[in-house]
């Protein structure tokens, strides 16, 4: 006779089971994102829906043109990078562009980083890119911390990743933890404003984490430098193949590293949430107690066998004046008794 599946049985822990669960979670996540996107689109006005459709068509056309004319596009980028290198004040212009793109909701950080690699090479463009990025991020952090705090809080609430990392940083705002978060694949400018809304996070810790993680910009510089070499007509075919392989390997290694770090952070977040729920189960949740009420229990709240006095016992004994416990004290005492019984039960399970 076949054995029926029990809900109490532990889930499968094999490799294929983990892969299946991971694929199921990813599929469910994509389905939720699709539903959210559809709901957001349907909530827009008719004019905005038309504009969104036009923008989608334009994006598709641009993507097709890039695939067809990518060779000419790369050659154009090479020409622009050569002219930029000869431009008076070119370093200052690129510095200011990277500096201000650190303010949300501006975009273009990755493109500017690649441009720095194409113009100034690898690793010679790192001092310019790192100084502009670190200073811009720090100034954006200070602006959103002291002047645009409400906008930063909205950024946190608008993104699930930001909410998750904010929950972790409220419990542990150490430099090491922030370094791991800065290495995660988060939107560059938006993360600067969102992290500023966490009061437990020190500005100096944020600056230190930005400086420590600045070497990751070498990846953008390397890719930009190789793209320029790939578009150079003087480069032979074998060198171009090596450049393409190096770009793919570098991108895959960087993506794998950030994915591993992100997974570790997700596991830490899950562990923290599970620990909080377990503590609430064992010790109760005191959020529902009225604020400002000081409850003190004394020996009058218990009988000679250390059992909590009930309401009926109070009604019987209050006329004699032997006990003075209030209703609030009795309620808290009952709650303490239930917690004690829960703890005892867990100790013997």
Curated annotation (Swiss-Prot):
Q: Does the keyword Transmembrane helix apply?
A: yes
InterPro entries given in the database record: Golgi_membrane_TVP38/TMEM64 (IPR051076), VTT_dom (IPR032816)
In which compartments does the protein localize?
Answer: Golgi apparatus membrane
- Classify the main location: Golgi
Where, in residue ranges, is this chain on the Lumenal side? 1-49, 113-123, 214-240
**Entry annotated with the keyword Glycoprotein:** yes
Q: Where is this region: VTT domain?
A: 117-227
Q: Which Pfam families match?
A: VTT_dom
Bilayer-spanning residue ranges: 50-70, 92-112, 124-144, 193-213, 241-261
What are the UniProt keywords, alphabetically? Answer: Glycoprotein, Golgi apparatus, Membrane, Transmembrane, Transmembrane helix
Q: How does it sit in the membrane?
A: Multi-pass membrane protein
Specify the glycosylation sites in chain numbering: 25
List the ranges whose topology is Cytoplasmic. Answer: 71-91, 145-192, 262-349
> Gene Ontology cellular component?
Golgi membrane
Name the GO terms of the biological process aspect: mitotic spindle elongation; vesicle-mediated transport
Family of this protein? Belongs to the TVP38/TMEM64 family.
What UniProt notes about the protein's domains is:
The VTT domain was previously called the SNARE-assoc domain. As there is no evidence that this domain associates with SNARE proteins, it was renamed as VMP1, TMEM41, and TVP38 (VTT) domain.
Task of the protein: Golgi membrane protein involved in vesicular trafficking and spindle migration.
Protein name per UniProt: Golgi apparatus membrane protein TVP38
Q: Per the UniProt entry, what species is this protein from, by scientific name?
A: Meyerozyma guilliermondii (strain ATCC 6260 / CBS 566 / DSM 6381 / JCM 1539 / NBRC 10279 / NRRL Y-324) (Yeast)
The organism's lineage is: Eukaryota, Fungi, Dikarya, Ascomycota, Saccharomycotina
